[in-house]
């Protein structure tokens, strides 16, 4: 029960929650293929409404094709990404081209998805690109990105940034920065590192500063 200023009430719920994941993979001489579906369903069993609150959730639903001969890979569908300037789940695609053993170009575009029970929402769009420099000096991976997001044809986010990963045997460091050049504001700076000493003692450190939520007109309108 819930008490509001001396008045109490109760909320009852009877529902069945279920989630499932299906993955299909194929590895060939030239092409590698993967498809993944992660979905959920809520069955409202309260029986007190002619229109029950049944809910379908689609967390991931995508296909991934990699051409080893050309060094090109493509992923299409609903997917989740938290780098390259992408802030989470979206409906869209990523195309990556391994232009050299240590360098990869990525182009991506899509429709941001804020809740897995959403259908395709066309009022929000984003597009961007990034460059990966891999295994530099056998120690460092670097990703540099630019990402533009629009809501109802209004610029919502104009971001550029980078992520650096360093692995040096007994030490590691991951650092990232996200800067919105539309607002001339820093959105986030984060770093995570650890060091293991000869006596097996491990020291870890973390720094995380960010705007919460990120500066966007849509976030401002929703409070």
Task: Describe the function of each predicted region.
Residues 1-223:
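Gram-negative and organellar
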């Amino acid at each position: 029960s819930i008490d509001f200023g001396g008045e109490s009430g109760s909320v009852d719920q009877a529902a069945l929650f279920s989630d499932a994941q299906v993955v299909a993979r194929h590895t060939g001489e030239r092409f590698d293929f993967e498809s993944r579906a992660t979905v959920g369903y809520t069955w409202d069993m309260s029986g007190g409404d002619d229109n029950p609150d049944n809910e379908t959730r689609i967390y991931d639903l995508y296909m991934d094709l990699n051409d080893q001969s050309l060094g090109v890979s493509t992923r299409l569908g609903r997917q989740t990404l938290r780098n390259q300037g992408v802030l989470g789940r979206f409906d869209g695609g990523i195309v990556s081209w391994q232009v050299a053993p240590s360098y990869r170009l990525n182009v991506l575009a899509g429709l941001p998805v804020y809740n897995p029970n959403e259908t395709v929402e066309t009022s929000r769009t984003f597009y961007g690109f990034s460059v990966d420099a891999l295994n530099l000096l056998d120690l460092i991976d670097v990703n540099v990105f630019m990402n533009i997001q629009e809501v109802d044809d209004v610029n919502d986010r104009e971001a550029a940034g980078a992520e650096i990963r360093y692995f040096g045997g007994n030490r590691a460091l991951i650092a990232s920065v996200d800067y919105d050049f539309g607002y001339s504001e820093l959105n986030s700076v984060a770093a995570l590192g650890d060091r293991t000493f000869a006596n097996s003692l491990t020291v870890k450190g973390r720094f995380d500063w960010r705007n919460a939520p990120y500066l966007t007109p849509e976030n401002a309108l929703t409070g």
